[in-house]
Amino acid sequence: MAHPAPTDPAAPARWTVEQYLRLVDEGVLGPDDKVELLEGVIVTMAPANLPHDAGVVRVTHALIRAVGDRAVVRVQLSLKVGPYSLPEPDAAVVPGRIADYDHERPTTALLVVEVSDTSLKQDRLTKRALYAAAGIPEYWIVNLRDDCVEVRREPEPDARRYASVKIARRGERIELVGLPGVSVAVDDLLPSPPR
């Protein structure tokens, strides 16, 4: 759902990252506004629920343990992927060291992860197209509805899609293509089934 734009008739039809950040700096958008910039549109993020929160915690812990100091794991922080998009993925593994991002946002990632319950359609369509167009080599959707992880690889930026899509299930491991030798168990990413 698009966030209502400021009532200024001169507001652009498509917001740039710089214009969006100015709205944040000027207090037009605040911390209580759960929005992100996708393709120049200010979009309301799906509200978090307990399964989503549990998934984010599990993904965070699993990635930090697996990646160690070979890259940086960022959680629900913005990623600048072009002049019109500043998504806030649930997790991103970015190259470099923590200090590399003290004064600037990352513009790429080795892996982006969305934990998906109520946002599955947007994560499969809008976010997939956005991350593929940015050339992000690997995109996982931790699909809470179907209790699996959708692994997308081999981005085709011009087509805004991934050539490879695999479903990973409990009992399997997923190796990160950007960090050879690093893998994560699917069971560590998915919340435990309800009792």
Positions of the model-derived regions?
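Gly/Pro/Ser/Thr-rich low-complexity, intrinsically disordered segments predominantly at protein N-termini
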Residues: 1-195
